[in-house]
Amino acid sequence: LIALLKQQKNIDARGIELSQKGVSLAVSKGIAVVQGDADADLFHYPDKGFDFVVLSQTIQATRRPEIVLRELLRIGRHAIVSFPNFGFWRMRAHLLLKGEMPVTEDLPYTWYDSPNIHFCTIRDFFDLCAQADARIDKFVALGGGRRPLPDSWPLAVKNVIGEQAVFLLSQKDGD
């Protein structure tokens, strides 16, 4: 996501990545990345030091999602958070019909070796945002082929049909 934003919007982008392999891959693509842990290292960054902070496909793998979300909004004026929707109908059907956790293109790990420790639906993330005093400025559910689902569709439908979710957030108090 950072590479896409850098390419299309010509932004000054920097990242934090847990794995050394991920750091090496990002650096090879010209993205400034340091190795770090969102659960432990965000407190090092200054208040409102960034216009936008991006947490892409990671919140479900953090130990303390609410604290991480609050830290994102402390260090950035806005946060962009994306994650796989565990409420997606195919995942529900797989669990119901096969009785086992699904392994998909977006979630390529078995349950016992997955970095995902908090299985989150789109509806769950709305609740987390309320708990963390995060204002949802924009929300997009992505369906097949990463196409945005229509804004007019109800949240309940997006929670079942959306494979991924992307949120643009800011602090409720406007800080």
Question: What is the predicted function of each stretch?
Answer:
Residues D41-D47, R63:
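Short conserved loop adjoining the S-adenosyl-L-methionine
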Residues D12, G49-D51:
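Structural signature of beta-strand start/N-cap positions in the alpha/beta core
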Residues K48-G49, I75:
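Alpha-helix C-terminal capping/helix-to-coil transition sites in glycosyltransferase folds
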Residues K9, L72-I75:
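Catalytic cores of nucleotide-enabled group-transfer and carboxylate-activating enzymes in metabolic
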Residues I67-E71, H78-G174:
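S-adenosyl-L-methionine-dependent methyltransferase catalytic module, highlighting the catalytic core
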Residues D51-R64, F83:
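A short SAM/SAH-binding and catalytic strip from SAM-dependent methyltransferases
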Residues L1-D41:
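Class I SAM-dependent methyltransferase SAM/SAH-binding core
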Residues I31-V34, D51-V54, L96-E100, L155-A156:
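Short, hinge-like loop/turn segments at secondary-structure boundaries
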